[in-house]
């Protein structure tokens, strides 16, 4: 009888270990599929390689536009948009992330008024960067308004150095933005408070820089990712997959990127904003980065009696 009990216990233990092993493999496998698609680096500028601030077009891969409600309208606006009034002379610049040597970040600096403030532009992903029409148009709008700008490629994007096959959703990239700030202070003699920043889509992770650097005087967040686990859930739901896959995606993504993807949060900027102005804009029907990101950020700012303004746009996606 004792022999049979011992044999049964061994079988139960073996089954348990087998189940645990298979479950672990499945967890890692699911996480890898989710994370590798979500955070794979895609450096270079692709079809926009020839774009520069003084000579760019709105050309795009029109077939790649997803069938959102406003896609047709957006395509028509872009095809017929005259960019000639938004092309400006610029300076090629380079600098390193704050606290990290050996990584060169490359950007375009436009100065229209030596006495004006400056805005650092932070792009989204995947194949993205300073060369995309959206970023160049923003630089043109700022110049038209008499505001200087620095638009640059984060590490692993555009023409900046590649140090990994994966991006880290702001966990490392916020240091790139701090490097841009330091360059403006040291090389262009701006004073703290004269430098603002914008963050678009997945570039929202760089808002951590706003939390760390009180010299950044203002922040504009456009359809920004401010909660990485939430955006993974958003994307899984959009593609028709169970949202509980987000957990392994975040965990394995951290292993791939070499840093926990939840170590820092852009929501820290809402806690540390003080009286610095923050503007949030978001499409109410955004299927990729849900409006909940901006709403949560707004709520945090309000609870801290901070200076926040919002524009949530009806019938608009990402």
What is the role of each PLM region?
Residues 1-83:
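N-terminal targeting or regulatory segments adjacent to alpha/beta-hydrolase or S9 domains
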Residues 68-114:
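N-terminal cap/lid segment of alpha/beta-hydrolase-fold proteins
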Residues 139-161:
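Conserved alpha/beta-hydrolase
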Residues 209-260:
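Hydrolase active-site cap/lid region
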Residues 273-274, 279-282, 286:
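Short beta-strand/loop motif that positions the catalytic acidic residue
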Residues 287-293:
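Conserved alpha/beta-hydrolase "acid-adjacent" motif
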């Amino acid at each position: 009888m004792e022999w049979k009990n011992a044999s049964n216990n061994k079988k139960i233990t073996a089954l348990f270990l087998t189940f645990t092993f298979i479950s672990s493999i499945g967890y890692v496998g699911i996480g890898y599929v989710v994370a590798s698609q979500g955070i794979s680096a895609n450096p270079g500028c692709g079809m926009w390689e020839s774009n520069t601030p003084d000579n760019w077009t709105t050309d795009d891969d029109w077939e790649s536009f997803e069938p959102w409600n406003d896609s047709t309208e957006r395509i028509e606006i872009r095809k017929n948009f005259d960019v000639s009034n938004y092309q400006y002379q610029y300076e090629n610049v380079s600098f390193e992330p704050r606290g990290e040597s050996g990584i060169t970040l490359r950007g375009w600096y436009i100065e229209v008024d030596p006495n004006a403030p400056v805005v650092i532009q932070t792009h989204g992903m995947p194949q993205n960067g300073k060369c995309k029409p959206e970023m160049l148009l923003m630089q043109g709008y700022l110049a038209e308004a008499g505001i200087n700008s620095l638009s640059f490629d984060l590490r692993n994007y555009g023409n900046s150095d590649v140090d990994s096959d994966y991006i880290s959703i702001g966990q490392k990239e916020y240091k790139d933005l701090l490097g841009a700030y330091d360059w403006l202070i040291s090389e262009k003699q701006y004073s703290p408070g004269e430098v603002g920043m914008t963050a678009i889509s997945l570039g929202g992770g760089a808002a951590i820089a706003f939390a760390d650097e009180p010299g950044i005087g203002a922040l504009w967040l456009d359809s920004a990712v401010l909660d990485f686990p939430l955006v993974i859930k958003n994307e899984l739901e959009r593609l028709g997959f169970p949202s509980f896959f987000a957990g392994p995606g975040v965990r394995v993504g951290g292993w791939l990127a070499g840093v926990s993807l939840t170590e820092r949060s852009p929501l820290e900027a809402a806690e540390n904003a003080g009286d610095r102005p923050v503007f949030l804009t978001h499409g109410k029907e955004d299927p990729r980065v849900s409006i909940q990101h901006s709403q949560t950020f707004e709520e945090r700012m309000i609870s801290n009696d901070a200076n926040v303004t919002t524009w949530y746009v009806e019938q608009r996606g990402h």
